[in-house]
Amino acid sequence: MEKDLVSVYRPPISSAYIPTHSITLEEVWERITSKDLQEKTQRLRTLRSEGKEEEYKSLKKESLPSVTFGGTFDYRRIDPQEYREYLLRELEREKDPIKVSKMKGTIGLLEGKVGLLESSGFVIIDIDHISETGLSLQELKDRISEDKEIGVRLVFTSPSGDGLKVVCRVSSQITDTDSYKTAYNSLRHF
């Protein structure tokens, strides 16, 4: 696997937050297959199989870390106001003066920025509701893993147990939202 880095975010999943650190795809795989995450994932799948969809969604959001496969970020946000409020809450709890200074600086620099530090060249494809296709999860995973055309680097089962996450290398570096969309759309046939 490549040494390109991706950002990791602690739970809860939010539209605006600061990554805790960066790791390689190999380390992503190690975390996904770790005992801790396997236990959390199994708990989620049990809730789903029992028809407890709202509990499943809530626990998933609150218990699983997330990753931005597109590269490393100094922050990630969708709504600038929500992100600003998040930072202000974090400032109240943070004791490290260096982190406090960085957060205060970030609050002033938010508008119009995505926070991408370095592109990994990866795009992630979510394939949901596989059980509805008539294919087995393993069969589809095997077929995708063997496809040399789409540059597959990592394939894993989604927390629901009924989907796949497929990380692909694209030929061009992704530097902004438009280039990400172009790269993603190049894989739509998939």
Predicted regions and their residues:
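Histidine-centered divalent-metal-coordination microenvironment in nucleic-acid enzymes
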Residues: 125, 153-175
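A short, contiguous, amphipathic alpha-helix enriched in charged residues
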Residues: 122-150
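Catalytic micro-motifs at enzyme active sites that drive phosphoryl/nucleotidyl and oxygen chemistry
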Residues: 109-114, 141-159
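Structural alpha-beta junctions
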Residues: 53, 61, 146-154, 189-190
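Generic "edge-of-domain/loop-turn" microfeature
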Residues: 13-15, 74, 132, 162, ...
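Helical (often loop-to-helix) elements that flank the catalytic cores of nucleotide-handling enzymes
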Residues: 134, 139-143, 170-190
